[in-house]
Amino acid sequence: MAADKAADQGAEKHDGAGTSGITDQEKELSSSALQAFLAGNYDACLQHLNTLQDINKDDYKITLNTAVAEFCKSNQTTTDNLRQTLNQLKNQVHSAVEEMDGLDDVENSMLYYNQAVILYHLRQYTEAISVGEKLYQFIEPFEEKFAQAVCFLLVDLYLLTYQAEKALHLLAVLEKMISQGNNNSKNGKNESGNNTNKDSSNQKAESGALIEVAKSKIHQYKVRAYIQMKSLKACKREIKSVMNTAGNSAPSLFLKSNFEYLRGNYRKAVKLLNSANIAEHPGFMKTGECLRCMFWNNLGCIHFAMGKHNLGIFYFKKALQENDNACAQLGTGSSDPGKKFSGRPMCTLLTNKRYELLYNCGIQLLHIGRPLAAFECLIEAVQVYHSNPRLWLRIAECCIAANKGTSEQETKGLPSKKGIVQSIVGQGYHRKIVLASQSIQNVVYNDGQSSAIPVASMEFAAICLRNALLLLPEDQQEPKQENGSKPNNQLGGNTENSESSEACSNKSHEGDKFIAAPPSSPLKKQELENLRCSILACSAYVALALGDNLMALNHADKLLQQPKLSGSLKFLGHLYAAEALISLDRISDAITHLNPENVTDVSLGISSNEQDQGSDKGENEAMESSGKQTPQCYPSSVTSARTMMLFNLGSAYCLRSEYDKARKCLHQAASLIHPKEIPPEAILLAVYLELQNGNTQLALQIIKRNQLLPSVKTLSDMRKKPVFQPVHSLQPIQMPTFTAVQRK
């Protein structure tokens, strides 16, 4: 579509080139060339242009129009030739775009606009915006049609680079421009009085149709902008306008489906997608958009949000197949290195969405529990989206998940007693019980290879997390807990992402600062700080796994210093700091972190009253029930979290030989949970305490029964304590190592 605009606008230079120094013959040739171009008769157009070039060899505009006509004659497949000609003409007029500083450059505006269109299709969005913004400075002298084309191109570029607020400002300018143009045409009609004829009425009808098309495009762009900003109340108003102006076209239905998806109305979103008539779409060879690929991708996003991850990955794979089929039809282009963008229509340079789809597949596979497959997808996507800190975090999470087995895997090979007894040796009087070692410190994961090699190792996870932290801006304000990633969502030809937990509690202000995180939607300031907290928590965990206790302590301390830290991450921060301090033989400092009173909340995000203050969108309430499920193995309440604190506190007291305090912590913790929920580390701690106390037989009874033996008074006294109310579940933790004793 933009290629057509480039061609049309380039040809229009004939009509606008009339000056006092031009002859009647040149005017006639120019007009004939324009009419032939608009009629699609490019051979006749080129003949007229060649005649003009013979008459006026110094006019570069004729060369420009010739290049555009030849480009259209080739069905827009000679992109490299057009690009080369535009660069030569630009060097002839100006050495750089930055030199555009006067009204004389208005004469060269068509050259720069065509160059911006080329850059747009080559995905060089920053350079295209630079050219477009220079053109926008001189927009007043432009013809109305050309001014609108410049504005629409800039709006598209702003949305592709996730600058939604700039896009909305430009759309307001466009609305005013169209409104003024409409009023001027009405005034002109009134002045002409009875002199109107059939031609003028046809022209008026054509102008009215163009205005309606422009208004419809404005409404669609507004919906895309509001979706990026997660401003659903404003989006709802614009959706109605889109449906009124564009009807049940595929773009309008895809946009409305995206809107319902963000509201949490997933069944309605699926119904809208299914109602879109994809067969009527012109096809990616004409528009550059593979609608079938978008359809399957959007279904995958919706099922991801519903928690149906296996269905989601099925649809994402279908989208990848459609994308690969489209790319196969397009071919690889010219074999000549200088013609790599030629041999296919220019609009199809934007067809390939492989890396966006790989990003989606990676996030989905991570949720399914297939971290290695997710790693392969995300490591390919990060080659393109290397500036996205959240993507680096997801890759690190793949590495962590791949190197941390489930509870069943962790006890594999330890045949009995929940992994407490490793083996039994000897017979009769010499019969001995060998206890399992629980030590996991200083594990080497990379087998001697460089940690910079992209493999799913903990060393590579540390590099990914370091990259993520470096990509975050320094400003820190108002963090709240991030609640997982959504796949990005391509609707109506654009790539968008929604995170339901974030969108439901954030208010879109005009002054909000957005941080780009392609291919996802940009991050708001609050979301950015949530991301910072998640990265710090993962960094502390990875450092502990690698035995880098000083770095782990540094990350844990930074995590605990974050303002408005969520309860779950605060809990993790204290545990990670305590584990690092114990390894550094700073037991007293570790005991301070292991105080159960530090745990007052284990929720995943900010409190409900803060969410109410941060949201003015009544529609967002439906998004709370996204269908996602938190794994059952997570501590689910303050009670279970404090229990874990007490078990670890008892371990710390043992290291200081304060066995009475350790025993008190152990039985206090055991009184708060069901006996079957007591971890094997706590059983080993009880065995260790009894052995230190000389009660060998009692220690053997604990191992035999695989449970803590209740003390005479302590346990009954502890049960009189009030039970804490359960709250939300939280993330898994790495427990500090308990001391295991092996009898000889």
Curated annotation (Swiss-Prot):
Provide the family line: Belongs to the CNOT10 family.
Q: Which gene encodes it?
A: CNOT10
Compositionally biased spans, kind Polar residues: 484-506, 602-612
Naming one, the record's GO cellular component terms include:
cytoplasm
What taxonomic lineage is listed for the species of origin?
Answer: Eukaryota, Metazoa, Chordata, Craniata, Vertebrata
Name of the molecule in the record:
CCR4-NOT transcription complex subunit 10
Organism of this sequence:
Gallus gallus (Chicken)
Q: What is its quaternary makeup?
A: Component of the CCR4-NOT complex. CNOT10 and CNOT11 form a subcomplex docked to the CNOT1 scaffold.
Coiled-coil boundaries:
72-106
What's one Pfam family here?
Answer: TPR_8
